[in-house]
């Protein structure tokens, strides 16, 4: 008997919806990264994108533990001298709440060429609605403790 190796044509992509309302950011990001990589499937292959599409709702209502709301910062650099921009989570949540979830999930994806393909399958929305109803996504529960 030969070892089964998945091929790109053998992967059937499904759609999943995760509601982040009141759930800790790390728990949402961990579940999303697992689904995007395809680690929930029996045909998971590390060198192949076997993951599904993930839609995350209510990104503006995601929960942070401890004092992260005041202490955690996001850094961006333009590449020019003195081009470092630093923003606290409190400011990012008001200006662009989707970025909190996107950055957390992106950090949990592998640092390989496949990560861009996996990241493209992530859709994050600040509110409770999304335009992907035609794909018939299944709802995924994430522990909120």
Short names for language-model regions:
Residues 1-103, 113, 131-145:
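Ribosome large-subunit tunnel/peptidyl-transferase-proximal elements
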Residues 106:
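Acidic, metal-associated active-site segment
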Residues 109-131:
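C-terminal structural segments of small proteins and small subunits
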């Amino acid at each position: 008997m030969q070892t089964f190796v998945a091929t790109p044509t053998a992967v059937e992509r499904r759609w999943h919806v995760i509601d982040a309302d009141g759930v800790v950011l790390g728990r949402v990001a961990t579940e999303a990264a697992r689904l995007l990589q395809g680690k929930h499937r029996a045909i998971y292959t590390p060198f192949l994108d076997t993951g599904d599409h993930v839609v995350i709702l209510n990104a503006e209502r995601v929960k942070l533990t401890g004092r992260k709301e005041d202490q955690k910062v996001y850094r961006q650099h333009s590449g020019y001298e003195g081009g470092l921009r630093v923003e606290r989570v409190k400011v990012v949540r008001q200006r662009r709440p989707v970025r909190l979830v996107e950055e957390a999930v992106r950090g949990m994806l592998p640092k390989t060429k496949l990560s861009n393909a996996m990241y493209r399958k992530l859709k994050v929305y600040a509110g409770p609605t999304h335009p992907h109803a035609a794909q018939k996504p299944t709802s995924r529960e994430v522990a909120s403790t």
